[in-house]
């Protein structure tokens, strides 16, 4: 039996400034994932530090916070069968040089000097997805609606 999950995706500054928002969203929709919440925001340092809390003691933490707060980002909640795992596979390896062609990071990720511009953040577990979604979205900002097949064939218009 399939398990419907929700996961958080952040389209990061390097993707925003390169005009990749539509391409990235399109890939998720074509895969059959449903967008149940989405907005463009400018993440402040406080929110960024909460989001990346697990990296606080790592040497790249300050650079990561500087990077994610540099421009607006698009945050979205995707829903679907095994959404966390599906999105992680679509994203590819964290480091773009290790990401397979055909994945989002493999196709669009860059390494510029010492910086890794890996295009998107994707929750790494159901537990982190729940925590991250609650950081960026209020419950009333997430929507339930039928997909086309349900709308046209099962429930009617």
From Swiss-Prot:
Official protein name in the record: Nucleoside diphosphate kinase
Reactions performed catalytically: a 2'-deoxyribonucleoside 5'-diphosphate + ATP = a 2'-deoxyribonucleoside 5'-triphosphate + ADP; a ribonucleoside 5'-diphosphate + ATP = a ribonucleoside 5'-triphosphate + ADP
HAMAP family found in the cross-reference section: NDP_kinase
E.C. numbers: 2.7.4.6
Species whose genome carries this gene: Pyrococcus horikoshii (strain ATCC 700860 / DSM 12428 / JCM 9974 / NBRC 100139 / OT-3)
Keyword ATP-binding: yes
Keyword Nucleotide-binding appears in the UniProt entry: yes
Compartments, record wording: Cytoplasm
Family: Belongs to the NDK family.
A cellular component term, taken from the record's GO annotations: cytoplasm
Biological-process GO terms, alphabetical: CTP biosynthetic process; GTP biosynthetic process; UTP biosynthetic process
